[in-house]
Amino acid sequence: MKEERPIIALDFSSFEETKAFLDLFPAEEKLYVKIGMELYYAQGPDIVRSIKSLGHNVFLDLKLHDIPNTVRAAMAVLKELDIDMATVHAAGGVEMLKAAREGLGQGPTLIAVTQLTSTSEDQMRGDQNIQTSLLESVLHYSKGAAKAQLDGVVCSAQEVEAIKAVTPTGFTCLTPGIRPKGSNIGDQKRVMTPNQARRIGSDYIVVGRPITQAKDPVAAYQAIKAEWAG
């Protein structure tokens, strides 16, 4: 089921920056935001509690990757923060993914990171020594996530249709690397516009700098939200 709101990546390191950004939006505008490593490691669990207290949904993107027992225990701790979504690295293997699901329980959405959208096929082959195609690697990780009873994967929009063809009905595809037409793609290698992501079947999109660094973040958010809605 498609999330109607684009998820905003809060690419900040301080509580003050985060609060100043969120305060730009009307109180009745309930957002879906992504807290990544930078903000969480700088501010800790309190930043999650603070944002949740405002009524926003929180996607905690820490990409856990460790032995199964450690990941299970860490997810059990994160569950207490009432997060709405969390991530693990699919490369940790099916047993680790199952442990993550056990720790987080069935309430929050749990998705696996396949290949980062900053990774090209040449980089994957050279750095990771994976000699299949990038798409084949993503599909392999996606099938492992489905086997472990995860809700979906993080993937490039270019991979959504192929993933949905090899995973159960309802398997979720969250797409970062979304850029409005004409914007700077930054360090992303595999990008799409909100409209393209919608048409190809993405269930969630994540947008950071085109909103957080816009001259008018609220207007930028509303424009992207409208394009995503179709």
Swiss-Prot record:
Reactions this protein catalyses: orotidine 5'-phosphate + H(+) = UMP + CO2
UniProt entry keywords in alphabetical sequence: Decarboxylase, Lyase, Pyrimidine biosynthesis
Descriptive protein name: Orotidine 5'-phosphate decarboxylase
EC number(s) given by UniProt: 4.1.1.23
Function summary: Catalyzes the decarboxylation of orotidine 5'-monophosphate (OMP) to uridine 5'-monophosphate (UMP).
A Gene Ontology BP annotation from the UniProt entry: 'de novo' pyrimidine nucleobase biosynthetic process
Family of the protein in this entry: Belongs to the OMP decarboxylase family. Type 1 subfamily.
GO molecular function: orotidine-5'-phosphate decarboxylase activity
Binding sites annotated in the UniProt record for substrate: 11, 34, 61-70, 117, 179, 188, 208-209
Listed InterPro entries: Aldolase_TIM, OMPdecase, OMPdecase_AS, OMPdecase_bac, OMPdeCOase_dom, RibuloseP-bd_barrel
Keyword Cell inner membrane part of the UniProt annotation: no
Active site: 63
Subunit structure, interactors included: Homodimer.
Alphabetical list of SMART domains matching this protein: OMPdecase
A cellular-component GO term for this protein: cytosol
Involved pathway(s): Pyrimidine metabolism; UMP biosynthesis via de novo pathway; UMP from orotate: step 2/2
HAMAP family in alphabetical order: OMPdecase_type1_B
Disulfide bond positions: none
